[in-house]
């Protein structure tokens, strides 16, 4: 069975092979732990919450920051990670530089508490 890559497996596999990885420093995301998403859905159902709730990770991180954090977690060579700008890539689809969410409603209504990215790595890859 072919497993789909995510940023963690992509960076980890490349660095383990000693391959260079190009990661953008100007695209920012909020990585989300799937268990946090599941807990938020359960919380919304239990509270019979109405409306739209944003669920994501706790803070904005560039792909470069995410890659460096992954390399540190697995004790891999960060010097193989190349810093690039979005404008240098030939991406088929335009990507927004920043995506993220205001979590205040989810935090106050659902008692949502996002797991920090480093903690997520420790849980998934002890």
Where do the language-model regions lie?
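Glycine-rich Rossmann NAD(P)(H)-binding loop
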Residues: 23-28, 53-60, 109
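Residue-level signal for the nucleotide or nucleotide-sugar donor/cofactor binding architecture
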Residues: 2, 29-32, 61, 101, ...
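Residues in well-ordered alpha-helical elements
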Residues: 35, 42, 64, 104, ...
